[in-house]
């Protein structure tokens, strides 16, 4: 796993895993029974012999993995995914190459492993059903009906079909590769950071668990900043896959294809404080 901003990145896959808003064409209807008949017919034509699971998703393709088996009790699911509508149009993907092929690639976006929170109230019922029986390393493609986008849980399939879902989307085809499972996502992140540090930052230091730094130039003044001081810095933000996602340097931005003419590339102000929680980044620059 190679994402460093776990709190921020968690929100992205959760939006896909909880809302699961695919864009199927012309089959959306308030009558779930009618939609179900449409999906049965679509599967019968395109995937003869495939029948729905007990909950109601259609597993279209399955490449088994050999690692740990998914268990809903596992708190975190680490996965790659691609979402398509019934015509095959991609609405969302973590696959960089695929994104480039379809013209939706954005150099500032993160592509790769995403983290979903498992279980009721967090993961959509249809995604949980897709993951059931999967092992780490496996890839599964399934058609998930729109009524299984809910994070609520009911006793049987008919209960899901009867319920109306607020802001319900259309049914979609989800291809998911299960890359890992964990009850301790912090350890996963720390292990990834330590591996990165050993590979790219020889001589790295740490002042606390989970914080690593490498001094590339000694300061000319080692006196501590006063709490009312504003300092100005340049920075470049990089994910653990080496992808640059933000910078104050225009040349660096151009090099990594994230330059924007609407952005001002200048040192940013840091308002110092007595504790780390008091330290704030401001929008002001040194020549404002």
Task: Map each language-model feature to its residues.
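Sec-dependent bacterial lipoprotein signal peptides
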Residues: 1-23
């Amino acid at each position: 796993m190679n994402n460093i901003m776990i709190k921020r990145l968690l929100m992205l896959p959760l939006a896909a895993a909880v809302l699961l808003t695919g864009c199927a064409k012309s089959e959306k209807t308030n009558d779930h029974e009618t939609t179900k008949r449409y999906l049965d017919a679509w599967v019968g034509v395109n995937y003869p012999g495939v029948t729905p699971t007990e909950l109601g998703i259609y597993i279209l393709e399955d490449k088994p993995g050999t690692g740990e088996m998914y268990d809903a009790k596992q708190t975190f699911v680490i996965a790659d995914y691609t979402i398509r509508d019934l015509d095959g149009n991609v609405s969302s993907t973590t696959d960089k190459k695929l994104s480039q092929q379809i013209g939706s690639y954005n150099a500032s976006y993160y592509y790769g492993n995403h983290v979903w929170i498992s279980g009721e109230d967090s993961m959509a019922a249809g995604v949980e059903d897709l993951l059931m029986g999967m092992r780490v390393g496996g890839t599964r493609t399934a058609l998930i009906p729109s009524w299984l986008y809910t994070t609520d849980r009911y006793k049987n399939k008919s209960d899901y079909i009867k319920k109306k879902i607020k802001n319900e989307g259309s049914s979609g085809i989800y291809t998911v590769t299960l890359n890992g499972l964990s009850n301790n996502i912090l350890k996963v992140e720390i292990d990834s950071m330590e591996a990165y540090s050993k590979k790219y930052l020889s001589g790295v230091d740490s002042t606390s668990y989970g914080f690593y730094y490498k001094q590339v130039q000694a300061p000319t003044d080692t006196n501590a900043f006063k709490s009312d001081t504003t300092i100005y810095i340049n920075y470049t933000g990089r994910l653990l896959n080496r992808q640059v996602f933000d910078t104050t340097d225009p040349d660096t931005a151009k090099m990594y294809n994230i330059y924007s003419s609407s952005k001002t590339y200048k040192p940013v102000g840091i308002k110092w404080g007595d504790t780390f929680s008091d330290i704030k980044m401001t929008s002001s620059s040194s020549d404002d």
